[in-house]
UniProtKB/Swiss-Prot annotation:
Homology family: Belongs to the L-aspartate dehydrogenase family.
Subunit and interaction comment: Homodimer.
Keyword list, A-Z: NAD, NADP, Oxidoreductase, Pyridine nucleotide biosynthesis
Residue positions of the active site: 189
Organism lineage string: Archaea, Methanobacteriati, Methanobacteriota, Archaeoglobi, Archaeoglobales
Class of the enzyme per the UniProt entry, highest EC level: oxidoreductase
Additional remark text: The iminoaspartate product is unstable in aqueous solution and can decompose to oxaloacetate and ammonia.
Notes on temperature effects: Optimum temperature is 80 degrees Celsius.
Pathway: Cofactor biosynthesis; NAD(+) biosynthesis; iminoaspartate from L-aspartate (dehydrogenase route): step 1/1
One of the GO BP terms on file: NAD biosynthetic process
Name this protein carries in UniProt: L-aspartate dehydrogenase
EC annotation from Swiss-Prot or TrEMBL: 1.4.1.21
Gene Ontology MF terms: aspartate dehydrogenase activity; NAD binding; NADP binding; oxidoreductase activity, acting on the CH-NH2 group of donors, NAD or NADP as acceptor
Record function comment: Specifically catalyzes the NAD or NADP-dependent dehydrogenation of L-aspartate to iminoaspartate.
Length: 236
């Protein structure tokens, strides 16, 4: 399977090494910095390379700049920076391009778990609440930094709350979000879901990547799960 990577930071480098170890072929890596034999500097050159799927591991802006072009080029896309879809107009455009081209956008679960159960129960969900706890030093104070909707959270804290946007897509609801600056060394996500189906509580304590303490290891691993499913016949 031929895979293109967008972004060559901590996650991009991890994925490049993982792909080479697991029988995938890197078609191209798009980034303005860094060095790799498959590196390209622009989207046009990136799209000239033959590939089965592209992986975004860069930024919300990269998703907005490149998603539609990638899909129109006949390439499926895996997205990590899901906060880009807090822009409802952009989300609608991407869905329309998928419908017209027959291509797919795969939403990586990122730094959380339980998305399969949340998506399964989405039609019966009455309330979904995300509480994210981060080290207070990032904000210079302790306490509740933000409380509001997922759409507001993604706009005010675009680098912090891709998780909120992912939950909104999976649940079909505008998730209630609390961002708390706390005495924690690892990012913690607590998800409470209530509805006619029952109740779910999901708690994830993320270990950061050594290369970038602001990036969770689980986020990178969530992309490898999608890639394994695309390659293998048995999908989990």
């Amino acid at each position: 399977m031929l895979v293109g990577l967008i972004g060559y930071g901590a996650i991009g480098k991890f994925l490049a090494e993982w792909l080479e170890r697991n029988g995938f072929e890197i078609a191209a890596i798009l980034d303005v910095r860094g060095e790799h034999e498959k590196m390209v500097r622009g989207i046009d050159e990136f799209l000239q390379r033959e590939m089965d799927v592209a992986v975004e591991a860069a930024s919300q802006q990269a998703v907005k700049d490149y998603a539609e072009k990638i899909l129109k080029a006949g390439i499926d896309l895996i997205v990590l920076s899901t906060g880009a879809f807090a822009d409802r107009d952009f989300l609608s455009r991407v869905r329309e391009v998928c419908r017209k081209t027959g291509r797919r956008v795969y939403i990586a679960s990122g730094a959380i778990g339980g998305l399969d159960a949340i998506f399964s129960a989405s039609e019966l969900i009455e309330e979904i609440v995300l509480t994210t706890r981060k080290n207070w030093r990032q904000f210079g104070r302790k306490g509740v930094i933000f409380e509001g909707s997922a759409s507001e959270a993604a706009q005010k804290f675009p680098k912090n709350l891709n998780v909120a946007a992912t939950l909104s897509i999976a649940s079909g609801k505008d998730v209630k979000v609390r961002l708390v600056a706390d005495e924690v060394e690892e990012n913690i996500h607590e998800i409470l879901v209530r509805g006619e189906f029952g109740e779910m509580e999901i708690r994830v304590r993320n270990r950061p990547m050594r290369e970038n303490p602001k990036t969770s290891y689980l986020a990178a691993l969530s992309v490898t799960r999608i890639l394994r499913n695309l390659k293998e016949g048995l999908v989990v």
